A protein has these predicted regions:
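N-terminal Rossmann NAD(P)H-binding glycine-rich loop of SDR-like oxidoreductase domains
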Residues: 7-26
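NAD(P)-dependent short-chain dehydrogenase/reductase
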Residues: 124-125, 154-205, 210, 248
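Glycine-rich Rossmann NAD(P)(H)-binding loop
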Residues: 171, 175-177, 197-204, 229-239, ...
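NAD(P)H-binding glycine-rich loop region in Rossmannoid oxidoreductase-like domains
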Residues: 39, 50-91
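Conserved Rossmann-fold NAD(P)-dependent oxidoreductase catalytic core, especially the SDR/UDP-sugar
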Residues: 97-144
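Mid/C-terminal beta-alpha module of Rossmann-like enzyme folds, strongest
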Residues: 216-268, 273, 308
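Active-site Tyr-X1-5-Lys
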Residues: 131, 138-168
Length: 317
């Protein structure tokens, strides 16, 4: 685990960034930035020893930040409808580029991208590799993501070369292990008796657990290079989301209904090839079914409401 470093985390209030920040804060000087519209939301981060700053990345003003961070984790992301594409590009592409310029002395910078970068493949079980075509995907729950993902990757690649700045671009698959993740939304939908909607049946994913992300982070940062290094950040197992729902149905004693709702241009599956990542980090340490059961036991008692179910692809768009 990384220790004794000065680390900046953008979008620190995000569901991936929060546990990473808290884990890193135990042995490092961690700074976290976000908009922090409600000042009270800063309290748990400050209590954990994280220095916070209210910064809107889209504004491009980083005068309130030092420039001597040893590591940068760029996890900030704005989800937006297609009519907000200009705002999304400022927040997801232009602003981060200016931040990288400000933090160009960092030893390593991790830039989070995602599966939305890939052009769809007709086989839902296709394992997307880092060399696959990019740029033509459509995501119904975040239509500005494909353009933004391509944009931030291009800016990161430019900054790596222009500033001699070691960068690793991590294409994140489905995140698992906390109550607001897509697998958790599937559990809530099953418990609420909702139909599980997806672009295809089957709709396989390669989820990665937060515990694996925490211990793999040091190796991922060590892979940062000039030119930028691109790698899928995914789990080692691939499983359809319909199977997650069936497990939740089995444990709850509920029947589960499914519906396939194809979206023009959208991928039928979200499977990542973990080969390159495994060469860097070694194999994952968690087993999906075991961790999904733990998540079920955590989520089930509080399943009276479903938050943001459309994002979890469990309600028809």
């Amino acid at each position: 685990m990384i220790s004794g470093q000065k680390i900046l985390i953008t979008g620190v209030t995000g569901m991936v960034a929060t546990p990473l920040a808290h884990a890193l804060a135990r042995d490092n000087e961690v700074w976290g930035i976000a908009r922090f519209a409600d000042p009270e939301t800063r309290r748990p981060y400050e209590t954990a020893g994280i220095t916070t700053r209210a910064i809107d990345i889209a504004a491009g003003d980083f005068s309130d930040l030092p420039d001597d961070f040893t590591h940068v984790l760029h996890l900030s992301w704005m989800r937006a409808e297609i009519d907000q594409l200009q705002q999304a590009l400022r927040a997801n592409v232009e602003g981060p580029g200016l931040l990288f310029q400000h933090c160009r002395k960092a030893k390593a910078t991790l830039v989070m991208s995602g599966m939305g970068i890939y052009s769809p493949h007709p086989d839902p079980w296709h394992l997307y590799s880092e060399s696959d075509p990019i740029g033509r995907g459509a995501t119904s729950y975040a239509p500005t993501s494909p353009a933004s993902k391509a944009g931030i990757e291009a800016v990161a690649r430019f900054c790596a070369r222009a500033f001699d700045m070691p960068i690793v671009i991590a294409r994140l698959n489905t995140y698992n292990g906390t109550p607001l993740t897509m697998p958790a939304h599937v559990i809530r939908a099953v418990l609420a008796g909702k139909t599980i909607h997806a672009p295809n049946d089957p709709c396989p994913h390669s989820p990665i657990h937060i515990d694996d992300m925490i211990w793999q982070l040091e190796a991922m940062l060590d892979a940062a290079s000039t030119p930028a290094f691109i790698v899928n950040w995914c789990g080692d197992e691939t499983m359809p989301m319909q199977d997650w729902a069936r497990m939740a149905g089995e444990w709850s004693g509920r029947s589960v209904d499914f519906a396939a709702d194809p979206v023009a241009g959208a991928p039928l599956g979200s499977c990542s090839d973990p080969t390159l990542r495994r060469s860097i980090t070694g194999p994952c340490r968690t087993v999906f079914r075991d961790e999904f059961r733990k998540l079920y036991d955590q989520v089930a008692p509080a399943s009276a409401t479903i938050r943001d179910a459309k994002w979890g692809a469990v309600e028809k768009p």
